[in-house]
Amino acid sequence: TSRGLGDVYKRQDTDSENKDSSDSSTTSVLLDTSKELTGIHHAEIEVKDYGTIDVELDADTAPITVTNFVKLAQEGFYDGLTFHRIMDGFMIQGGDPNGDGTGGSEENIKGEFSNNGVDNDISHTRGTISMARASDPDSASSQFFIVQADSTFLDGDYAGFGHVTEGMDIVDKICEDAKPTDDNGTIPSDQQPVIEKITITD
């Protein structure tokens, strides 16, 4: 269905964790995405006029998904793209170069979720970041979503690959401001929040 989204894991406190808010400088790293990543990594999603959403990425649980996301971020793929689908009380979805839910990157990746034969215990609770996809379980490419409210009905069908550690207030504000034109959360192109940059910090 078009209600595509993802899977994140147990969120503890998403609004405060090892982040010095007085430090406005971002240090980026260049990870080797020629092979699957492992371990925990972090990204900063800068949203124009809103601020930065800090995300922890779990490459031990979803190595293909995290490696793909990091690769695209490091290539600048997401720079200037938008959140084109916003549903208050559900999620925000972005990362489509077409800005309407029909686009993606050049390649699709395997869906890392249980109903596709992959163990993934990241539940779609508030703050989870997950991959959007079409009906094909292996159709995810660049579009991702961040869960605003617990949506565990997505568990097993979408590849959660991390969680927000700081910035859920920004997600809430984006949802609050959104004026979708239909029940599917479609946002007019001139009103879509802009992803200025996604920086991989470690």
Which role does the model predict for each range below?
Residues 1-9:
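Single conserved hydrophobic/aromatic residue that forms the stacking wall/gate
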Residues 88, 96-99, 136, 151, ...:
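Acidic glycine-/aspartate-rich tracts in secreted/extracellular proteins
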Residues 91, 128-132, 141-174:
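Active-site scaffold segments
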Residues 53-135:
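Internal glycine-rich, Lys/Arg-flanked active-site/core loops of soluble domains
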Residues 181-190:
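Short proline/glycine-enriched turn/loop segments at secondary-structure junctions
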Residues 10-42:
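N-terminal, intrinsically disordered, polar/charged segments of Gram-positive cell-envelope systems
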Residues 37-44, 125-129:
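Short, hydrophobic/aromatic-rich segments at coil-to-beta transitions
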Residues 48-50:
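Glycine-centered tight beta-turn/hairpin loop motif at sheet-sheet or coil-to-beta transitions
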